[in-house]
Amino acid sequence: IEVNARLSRSSALASKATGYPLAFVAAKLGMGYGLFELKNSVTKTTSAFFEPALDYVVCKIPRWDLSKFHGVDRELGSSMKSVGEVMAIGRNFEEAIQKGLRMIGQGMHGYVENKELNIENIDESLQEPTDKRIFVISKAMHKGYTIDQIHDLTKIDKWFLQKLKHIIDIDEKLRKCTSVNVLDKYLLREAKVYGFTDFQIARAVGLEEEIHNMYKAGLVIRNLRKNYGI
Protein backbone atom coordinates (compact mmCIF):
# COMPACT_ATOMS: atom_id res chain seq x y z
CA ILE A 1 0.00 0.00 0.00
CA GLU A 2 2.63 2.50 1.11
CA VAL A 3 5.74 2.65 3.23
CA ASN A 4 5.41 4.68 6.43
CA ALA A 5 6.05 4.44 10.15
CA ARG A 6 2.44 4.16 11.24
CA LEU A 7 -0.59 1.93 10.86
CA SER A 8 -3.32 3.64 8.83
CA ARG A 9 -6.96 2.69 8.21
CA SER A 10 -5.94 1.26 4.84
CA SER A 11 -3.27 -0.98 6.30
CA ALA A 12 -5.69 -2.08 9.04
CA LEU A 13 -8.11 -3.14 6.32
CA ALA A 14 -5.34 -4.98 4.48
CA SER A 15 -4.43 -6.78 7.69
CA LYS A 16 -8.02 -7.90 8.31
CA ALA A 17 -8.56 -8.85 4.68
CA THR A 18 -5.43 -10.97 4.35
CA GLY A 19 -5.12 -12.31 7.88
CA TYR A 20 -1.52 -11.04 7.98
CA PRO A 21 -0.71 -9.31 11.33
CA LEU A 22 0.77 -6.11 9.94
CA ALA A 23 0.86 -4.20 13.26
CA PHE A 24 2.61 -7.04 15.10
CA VAL A 25 5.14 -7.60 12.30
CA ALA A 26 5.80 -3.86 11.88
CA ALA A 27 6.46 -3.49 15.62
CA LYS A 28 8.89 -6.43 15.60
CA LEU A 29 10.69 -5.07 12.55
CA GLY A 30 11.02 -1.73 14.33
CA MET A 31 12.70 -3.56 17.22
CA GLY A 32 15.31 -4.95 14.86
CA TYR A 33 13.96 -8.42 14.09
CA GLY A 34 14.08 -9.78 10.54
CA LEU A 35 11.06 -11.24 8.76
CA PHE A 36 12.73 -14.65 8.62
CA GLU A 37 13.02 -14.63 12.44
CA LEU A 38 9.30 -14.07 13.07
CA LYS A 39 6.89 -16.99 13.25
CA ASN A 40 3.74 -17.17 11.18
CA SER A 41 0.93 -16.37 13.64
CA VAL A 42 -1.33 -18.99 12.01
CA THR A 43 0.94 -22.01 11.51
CA LYS A 44 3.35 -21.23 14.40
CA THR A 45 6.04 -23.11 12.48
CA THR A 46 6.80 -21.26 9.25
CA SER A 47 8.22 -17.73 9.19
CA ALA A 48 6.36 -14.47 8.58
CA PHE A 49 8.47 -13.98 5.46
CA PHE A 50 5.70 -14.75 2.95
CA GLU A 51 3.17 -12.97 0.77
CA PRO A 52 -0.51 -13.69 1.54
CA ALA A 53 -2.28 -15.48 -1.33
CA LEU A 54 -5.99 -14.70 -1.58
CA ASP A 55 -8.66 -16.75 -3.35
CA TYR A 56 -11.43 -14.33 -2.38
CA VAL A 57 -12.48 -10.70 -2.88
CA VAL A 58 -12.75 -8.15 -0.07
CA CYS A 59 -15.04 -5.15 -0.48
CA LYS A 60 -14.99 -2.14 1.85
CA ILE A 61 -18.07 0.09 1.87
CA PRO A 62 -18.46 3.28 3.96
CA ARG A 63 -21.54 3.60 6.14
CA TRP A 64 -23.40 6.88 6.32
CA ASP A 65 -26.14 7.73 8.83
CA LEU A 66 -27.30 10.85 7.00
CA SER A 67 -30.98 9.97 7.47
CA LYS A 68 -30.62 10.62 11.22
CA PHE A 69 -29.83 14.29 10.63
CA HIS A 70 -32.61 16.45 9.21
CA GLY A 71 -31.63 19.01 6.60
CA VAL A 72 -28.15 17.58 6.04
CA ASP A 73 -26.66 17.72 2.55
CA ARG A 74 -26.60 14.14 1.24
CA GLU A 75 -24.08 14.93 -1.50
CA LEU A 76 -20.72 13.29 -0.91
CA GLY A 77 -17.45 15.07 -1.53
CA SER A 78 -13.95 15.42 -0.15
CA SER A 79 -15.17 15.98 3.42
CA MET A 80 -15.62 12.80 5.44
CA LYS A 81 -19.25 12.06 6.34
CA SER A 82 -19.10 8.33 6.98
CA VAL A 83 -19.53 7.07 10.54
CA GLY A 84 -17.95 3.69 9.90
CA GLU A 85 -17.38 1.04 7.29
CA VAL A 86 -18.15 -2.58 6.55
CA MET A 87 -15.86 -5.24 5.15
CA ALA A 88 -17.48 -7.98 3.07
CA ILE A 89 -15.75 -11.12 1.81
CA GLY A 90 -16.86 -13.23 -1.16
CA ARG A 91 -15.47 -15.55 -3.83
CA ASN A 92 -16.25 -12.89 -6.45
CA PHE A 93 -16.97 -9.16 -6.56
CA GLU A 94 -20.70 -9.62 -7.07
CA GLU A 95 -21.04 -11.70 -3.91
CA ALA A 96 -18.88 -9.35 -1.85
CA ILE A 97 -20.72 -6.17 -2.90
CA GLN A 98 -24.12 -7.71 -2.21
CA LYS A 99 -23.01 -8.85 1.25
CA GLY A 100 -21.61 -5.39 1.99
CA LEU A 101 -24.78 -3.58 0.91
CA ARG A 102 -26.80 -5.75 3.27
CA MET A 103 -24.59 -4.73 6.19
CA ILE A 104 -24.49 -0.93 5.82
CA GLY A 105 -27.73 -0.47 7.76
CA GLN A 106 -29.93 1.08 5.07
CA GLY A 107 -32.51 -1.69 5.15
CA MET A 108 -31.44 -3.11 1.79
CA HIS A 109 -31.32 -6.78 0.83
CA GLY A 110 -28.41 -6.39 -1.58
CA TYR A 111 -27.91 -4.70 -4.93
CA VAL A 112 -31.31 -5.80 -6.27
CA GLU A 113 -34.81 -6.68 -5.03
CA ASN A 114 -34.96 -3.80 -2.56
CA LYS A 115 -37.76 -1.41 -1.70
CA GLU A 116 -38.65 0.88 -4.59
CA LEU A 117 -36.76 4.18 -4.67
CA ASN A 118 -38.74 7.30 -5.54
CA ILE A 119 -36.51 9.07 -8.05
CA GLU A 120 -37.81 12.03 -10.07
CA ASN A 121 -34.86 12.32 -12.45
CA ILE A 122 -32.55 9.31 -12.82
CA ASP A 123 -29.94 11.23 -14.85
CA GLU A 124 -29.54 13.90 -12.16
CA SER A 125 -29.44 11.28 -9.40
CA LEU A 126 -26.68 9.42 -11.25
CA GLN A 127 -24.62 12.59 -11.60
CA GLU A 128 -24.86 13.50 -7.91
CA PRO A 129 -22.72 11.31 -5.62
CA THR A 130 -24.92 10.42 -2.62
CA ASP A 131 -25.21 7.54 -0.17
CA LYS A 132 -28.04 6.10 -2.32
CA ARG A 133 -26.40 6.35 -5.74
CA ILE A 134 -25.48 2.68 -6.05
CA PHE A 135 -29.17 1.83 -5.74
CA VAL A 136 -29.97 4.49 -8.34
CA ILE A 137 -27.53 2.68 -10.65
CA SER A 138 -29.43 -0.54 -10.00
CA LYS A 139 -32.73 1.12 -10.94
CA ALA A 140 -31.18 2.71 -14.04
CA MET A 141 -29.89 -0.67 -15.24
CA HIS A 142 -33.34 -2.18 -14.75
CA LYS A 143 -34.74 0.72 -16.79
CA GLY A 144 -32.44 -0.14 -19.69
CA TYR A 145 -29.52 2.26 -19.20
CA THR A 146 -26.34 0.95 -20.83
CA ILE A 147 -22.96 0.71 -19.13
CA ASP A 148 -21.64 3.52 -21.35
CA GLN A 149 -24.54 5.81 -20.42
CA ILE A 150 -24.06 5.21 -16.70
CA HIS A 151 -20.28 5.63 -17.05
CA ASP A 152 -20.75 9.02 -18.75
CA LEU A 153 -23.04 10.20 -15.95
CA THR A 154 -21.22 8.76 -12.93
CA LYS A 155 -17.59 8.47 -14.15
CA ILE A 156 -17.45 5.10 -12.35
CA ASP A 157 -14.98 2.67 -13.91
CA LYS A 158 -16.65 0.33 -16.41
CA TRP A 159 -15.19 -2.76 -14.71
CA PHE A 160 -17.37 -2.14 -11.66
CA LEU A 161 -20.38 -1.31 -13.81
CA GLN A 162 -19.96 -4.56 -15.76
CA LYS A 163 -19.95 -6.53 -12.50
CA LEU A 164 -23.07 -4.71 -11.29
CA LYS A 165 -24.73 -5.35 -14.66
CA HIS A 166 -24.00 -9.06 -14.21
CA ILE A 167 -26.09 -9.01 -11.01
CA ILE A 168 -28.91 -7.29 -12.93
CA ASP A 169 -28.73 -9.93 -15.68
CA ILE A 170 -29.16 -12.74 -13.14
CA ASP A 171 -32.02 -10.84 -11.50
CA GLU A 172 -33.75 -10.44 -14.87
CA LYS A 173 -33.46 -14.18 -15.51
CA LEU A 174 -35.00 -14.88 -12.10
CA ARG A 175 -37.87 -12.49 -12.82
CA LYS A 176 -38.70 -14.42 -15.98
CA CYS A 177 -39.54 -17.44 -13.80
CA THR A 178 -43.31 -17.19 -13.40
CA SER A 179 -43.24 -19.33 -10.26
CA VAL A 180 -40.84 -21.17 -8.00
CA ASN A 181 -41.76 -24.44 -9.73
CA VAL A 182 -40.00 -23.42 -12.95
CA LEU A 183 -36.83 -22.28 -11.16
CA ASP A 184 -34.17 -24.76 -12.27
CA LYS A 185 -31.21 -25.71 -10.12
CA TYR A 186 -28.60 -24.21 -12.47
CA LEU A 187 -30.10 -20.72 -12.26
CA LEU A 188 -30.60 -21.12 -8.52
CA ARG A 189 -26.96 -22.14 -8.08
CA GLU A 190 -25.78 -19.21 -10.22
CA ALA A 191 -27.82 -16.79 -8.11
CA LYS A 192 -26.37 -18.15 -4.86
CA VAL A 193 -22.80 -18.05 -6.23
CA TYR A 194 -23.18 -14.35 -7.00
CA GLY A 195 -24.51 -13.32 -3.61
CA PHE A 196 -28.30 -13.56 -3.85
CA THR A 197 -30.08 -14.39 -0.59
CA ASP A 198 -33.02 -16.78 -0.44
CA PHE A 199 -35.33 -13.80 0.10
CA GLN A 200 -33.95 -11.93 -2.93
CA ILE A 201 -34.62 -14.98 -5.09
CA ALA A 202 -38.10 -15.41 -3.58
CA ARG A 203 -38.98 -11.77 -4.30
CA ALA A 204 -37.59 -11.98 -7.85
CA VAL A 205 -39.79 -14.98 -8.77
CA GLY A 206 -42.86 -13.38 -7.15
CA LEU A 207 -43.04 -15.75 -4.20
CA GLU A 208 -43.24 -12.96 -1.61
CA GLU A 209 -46.39 -11.53 -3.22
CA GLU A 210 -47.92 -15.00 -3.33
CA ILE A 211 -47.23 -15.88 0.33
CA HIS A 212 -47.29 -12.32 1.79
CA ASN A 213 -44.56 -13.25 4.28
CA MET A 214 -40.91 -12.56 3.51
CA TYR A 215 -39.56 -15.10 5.99
CA LYS A 216 -41.76 -17.94 4.75
CA ALA A 217 -40.89 -17.05 1.15
CA GLY A 218 -37.19 -17.30 1.99
CA LEU A 219 -37.73 -20.67 3.67
CA VAL A 220 -39.41 -22.03 0.54
CA ILE A 221 -36.30 -21.18 -1.50
CA ARG A 222 -34.09 -22.63 1.23
CA ASN A 223 -35.96 -25.94 1.15
CA LEU A 224 -35.77 -25.95 -2.65
CA ARG A 225 -31.99 -25.49 -2.44
CA LYS A 226 -31.73 -28.42 -0.05
CA ASN A 227 -33.68 -30.60 -2.46
CA TYR A 228 -31.30 -29.62 -5.26
CA GLY A 229 -28.26 -30.15 -3.02
CA ILE A 230 -27.17 -26.50 -3.21
Predicted regions and their residues:
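ATP-dependent carboxylate activation and anion-phosphoryl transfer catalytic cores
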Residues: 1-195, 219
